[in-house]
Amino acid sequence: MYRALYAFRSAEPNALAFAAGETFLVLERSSAHWWLAARARSGETGYVPPAYLRRLQGLEQDVLQAIDRAIEAVHNTAMRDGGKYSLEQRGVLQKLIHHRKETLSRRGPSASSVAVMTSSTSDHHLDAAAARQPNGVCRAGFERQHSLPSSEHLGADGGLYQIPLPSSQIPPQPRRAAPTTPPPPVKRRDREALMASGSGGHNTMPSGGNSVSSGSSVSSTSLDTLYTSSSPSEPGSSCSPTPPPVPRRGTHTTVSQVQPPPSKASAPEPPAEEEVATGTTSASDDLEALGTLSLGTTEEKAAAEAAVPRTIGAELMELVRRNTGLSHELCRVAIGIIVGHIQASVPASSPVMEQVLLSLVEGKDLSMALPSGQVCHDQQRLEVIFADLARRKDDAQQRSWALYEDEGVIRCYLEELLHILTDADPEVCKKMCKRNEFESVLALVAYYQMEHRASLRLLLLKCFGAMCSLDAAIISTLVSSVLPVELARDMQTDTQDHQKLCYSALILAMVFSMGEAVPYAHYEHLGTPFAQFLLNIVEDGLPLDTTEQLPDLCVNLLLALNLHLPAADQNVIMAALSKHANVKIFSEKLLLLLNRGDDPVRIFKHEPQPPHSVLKFLQDVFGSPATAAIFYHTDMMALIDITVRHIADLSPGDKLRMEYLSLMHAIVRTTPYLQHRHRLPDLQAILRRILNEEETSPQCQMDRMIVREMCKEFLVLGEAPS
């Protein structure tokens, strides 16, 4: 911990302005003239001139509290940015956490009596963000790439270490194998010369020269730079009565984010002694001022844990969602931002606010996390909607034309149901859908079957799609219900309603996306005639389909249907394909999907994941010479190019490589490949490389078995490439 001896204000873009007496936690000695520090009061980070600071000794507990405050400040800044952590913020958190561990280790056995910060909100959000951000950097990967300094390499400031900065932000400095002790500062040499001559100066103004770390060079690729301990500033021989002008490059000050040092120029010297005499305080005042900035003692945190109910997070979520209509995730973000801001603005409330944030993170199921006797509002509304729709389904008068004026009421119910299924807590929705063996879901399916109004049918289809995204068990229920049969019949009988036709194809693809077995009775409506109907739409289109969206949806539906047909001799899709005279457009769309490596049927992340629909379809196509002939010669050459490229690019142990090998084996077996031998040398080299692999994983063993079978059946494949 360091305390500011003098007030400082600068127009530098990354410099922190501070008053005399403020305390700082030094995070990095970026250069000889600028140190990266965190303000103990608020956790704000920026660059400060070391000549203005004096180190405070024996304040480990206050250091820990300042570190906790800085961690929360970074977390609050990320929450204000939507809960996403930048690379710089991740680096600061890594540094602060490591600094905290080093401080605790230096405290010795006495540290065991102190409540160590458990899995904090900052750590939780950091790990969650690293898992879902495309550009996130996980902690393990960070530590592998940037080794942290060990405790024996640290000086008196043993918790200090560097954050790797982008090379474009680091000022050019000399690189060397190891830091060496720098020569004494100019002012110190002058003072020593004067003392040697017997005319030592009486000016006791502090100089920032000797407080500079000897290892001031910065490396962008390593955290192992070693620092020597800094000694307190020594009196110099002379000092300018006023600080020199500060280099100016801008007026904006960036907080809570790692930035390059303000400039390579020297930092301003502290003001003259007569200008700051009134601003200096005693050491006891330093301790008292620092004590007022503490986050609270261990006893206060323990009391906060007892005072804050474990259900407070769920109660806040329920209140915000009911009164604002925000989605479940947006409610969580909003509460996190508000509580984090209160925690930063009112330090006395920090222990309580931390417990609120923890309860917000730990609450998985909103309906279970609420206090006993309190029911989630979304759960209540789902009960009402499901019950009323079931009553209307069972009402015999509902089917009378005279009661069609209830369409507005049913529409409101279905729109509210869709809104809840989309925005509410998924755990609440899953629990309500699974109640009484999916009674509510099956009631909606029966209602869809008897409802003939297109607008209501469209809303029901949207609700079915939202249910499919909740859980794989709901998809299994819909597969076994009458819904697939009703959708297939509706698609073939009513081709005039383009929007309903598109939604029907989409929902059918969702229902069949998991590759589960279909009841045998369904194939009466999902057999070869239905497959031919879909192929006709792909090849010829419909007059009302001006957007050309329907052919792509029908391709996806054919791929999803084929997942349910393991036996090639009973594959109704392949039977329809062999009877179709021309499938040029369909084959081109298959090639496009194969080239991209996309699986349009894999819509959800439910487990277990089905096979790759495009690869399975092509394997079935080339399982018989009758269907293998659907591709034109040029398309066939392109298909071989794509397959060979994927086999070469995929790494050993990848499950997809086995699928591509099986596809290539089927192509060689059912097409005249040995006549044209397209890409044969490349294929031979790839197969020999796979045979020579030393990996022993089950996937690699399966790959080698397929290659041996190919070379045994077609000897030319096992020959050395010419």
Swiss-Prot record:
<feature type="region of interest" description="Disordered">
    <location>
        <begin position="101"/>
        <end position="122"/>
    </location>
</feature>
<feature type="region of interest" description="Disordered">
    <location>
        <begin position="149"/>
        <end position="286"/>
    </location>
</feature>
<dbReference type="GO" id="GO:0008092">
    <property type="term" value="F:cytoskeletal protein binding"/>
</dbReference>
<comment type="function">
    <text>Has an important role in stress fiber formation induced by active diaphanous protein homolog 1 (DRF1). Induces microspike formation, in vivo. In vitro, stimulates N-WASP-induced ARP2/3 complex activation in the absence of CDC42. May play an important role in the maintenance of sarcomeres and/or in the assembly of myofibrils into sarcomeres. Implicated in regulation of actin polymerization and cell adhesion. Plays a role in angiogenesis.</text>
</comment>
<dbReference type="GO" id="GO:0010976">
    <property type="term" value="P:positive regulation of neuron projection development"/>
</dbReference>
<dbReference type="GO" id="GO:0150052">
    <property type="term" value="P:regulation of postsynapse assembly"/>
</dbReference>
<feature type="modified residue" description="Phosphoserine">
    <location>
        <position position="294"/>
    </location>
</feature>
<feature type="compositionally biased region" description="Low complexity">
    <location>
        <begin position="206"/>
        <end position="240"/>
    </location>
</feature>
<dbReference type="GO" id="GO:0005654">
    <property type="term" value="C:nucleoplasm"/>
</dbReference>
<dbReference type="GO" id="GO:0005886">
    <property type="term" value="C:plasma membrane"/>
</dbReference>
<dbReference type="GO" id="GO:0017124">
    <property type="term" value="F:SH3 domain binding"/>
</dbReference>
<comment type="subunit">
    <text>Associates with the intermediate filaments, vimentin and desmin. Binds the first and third SH3 domains of NCK. Binds the proline-rich domains of N-WASP through its SH3 domain. Similarly, binds diaphanous protein homolog 1 (DRF1). Binds the SH3 domains of GRB2 through its proline-rich domains. Interacts with Helicobacter pylori toxin vacA. Isoform 4 interacts with FHOD1. Interacts with FASLG. Interacts with TMIGD2.</text>
</comment>
<feature type="modified residue" description="Phosphothreonine">
    <location>
        <position position="181"/>
    </location>
</feature>
<dbReference type="InterPro" id="IPR036028">
    <property type="entry name" value="SH3-like_dom_sf"/>
</dbReference>
<dbReference type="GO" id="GO:0098794">
    <property type="term" value="C:postsynapse"/>
</dbReference>
<dbReference type="GO" id="GO:0005882">
    <property type="term" value="C:intermediate filament"/>
</dbReference>
<protein>
    <recommendedName>
        <fullName>NCK-interacting protein with SH3 domain</fullName>
    </recommendedName>
</protein>
<dbReference type="GO" id="GO:0006897">
    <property type="term" value="P:endocytosis"/>
</dbReference>
<dbReference type="GO" id="GO:0071933">
    <property type="term" value="F:Arp2/3 complex binding"/>
</dbReference>
<dbReference type="Pfam" id="PF09431">
    <property type="entry name" value="SPIN90_LRD"/>
</dbReference>
<dbReference type="Pfam" id="PF00018">
    <property type="entry name" value="SH3_1"/>
</dbReference>
<feature type="modified residue" description="Phosphoserine">
    <location>
        <position position="120"/>
    </location>
</feature>
<dbReference type="GO" id="GO:0005829">
    <property type="term" value="C:cytosol"/>
</dbReference>
<dbReference type="InterPro" id="IPR018556">
    <property type="entry name" value="SPIN90/Ldb17_LRD"/>
</dbReference>
<dbReference type="InterPro" id="IPR035514">
    <property type="entry name" value="SPIN90_SH3"/>
</dbReference>
<keyword id="KW-0728">SH3 domain</keyword>
<dbReference type="InterPro" id="IPR030125">
    <property type="entry name" value="SPIN90/Ldb17"/>
</dbReference>
<feature type="site" description="Breakpoint for translocation to form KMT2A/MLL1-AF3P21 oncogene">
    <location>
        <begin position="57"/>
        <end position="58"/>
    </location>
</feature>
<keyword id="KW-0160">Chromosomal rearrangement</keyword>
<dbReference type="InterPro" id="IPR001452">
    <property type="entry name" value="SH3_domain"/>
</dbReference>
<keyword id="KW-0656">Proto-oncogene</keyword>
<dbReference type="GO" id="GO:0007010">
    <property type="term" value="P:cytoskeleton organization"/>
</dbReference>
<feature type="domain" description="SH3">
    <location>
        <begin position="1"/>
        <end position="58"/>
    </location>
</feature>
<feature type="compositionally biased region" description="Pro residues">
    <location>
        <begin position="169"/>
        <end position="185"/>
    </location>
</feature>
<keyword id="KW-0539">Nucleus</keyword>
<keyword id="KW-0597">Phosphoprotein</keyword>
<dbReference type="GO" id="GO:0098978">
    <property type="term" value="C:glutamatergic synapse"/>
</dbReference>
<feature type="short sequence motif" description="Nuclear localization signal">
    <location>
        <begin position="175"/>
        <end position="192"/>
    </location>
</feature>
<feature type="compositionally biased region" description="Low complexity">
    <location>
        <begin position="110"/>
        <end position="121"/>
    </location>
</feature>
<keyword id="KW-0729">SH3-binding</keyword>
